[in-house]
Amino acid sequence: LRWRGGLVLKSSSPDFGGWSGLVLDRDGRDFLAVSDSGAWLTGELIYDGVRPVGVRNARIGPLKALKDRPLLRLRDRDAEAVTLAQGTLRNGTILVAFEGNHRIGRFSISRNGVSGPRQYLQLPPEARRMRSNEGFEAVSVLKGGRYKGAIIALSERFKDDRGHHTGWIWVNGVQHKLHLTDIGGFNITDASALDDGGLIVLERRFGWLEGIKMR
């Protein structure tokens, strides 16, 4: 991984802020973000060589429930992770994972933005036991290897009896539980699939004395 630069984004929209999930198209230009207040943001990154210098064609709107109904309750709006499942961010399908009212939805995305979900993944009963602040924090679709096309979702800090992180993988629609070893008390905050079938997991830890650490 190489640091290319950063941007400070501002908007007068009341829906702007609290961005908790981000996905880029394969060319690294089109992006989609989702927020913990139930909004989506799309746009195109502008580069100077390899360094991002701005955003254009930005659009913002609310995530919706089935049949394009509004998400009225706060606990229904807390989107924490997003990934591209099919196509592109201009014409494709995305998966959005929510905390609070734990669920993972399939949404269509086009040049007009994000429509309401077509369906939700069937979750294992155990996932309903996650507390509101320890639910899904990462979702991705594996791009290669034996489980190419499988959906993987990881919880922030829902742990088993041995203290390991809990997640699930959907292979041909069938759920399987998996665990990640907890090393150093870090929480899971995002994940991204690699072309070879691997997965990069981003973790963070906060302490009043040490501040925020990420790896």
Task: Show which residues each predicted segment covers.
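Sequence/structural signature of beta-propeller domains
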Residues: 1-215
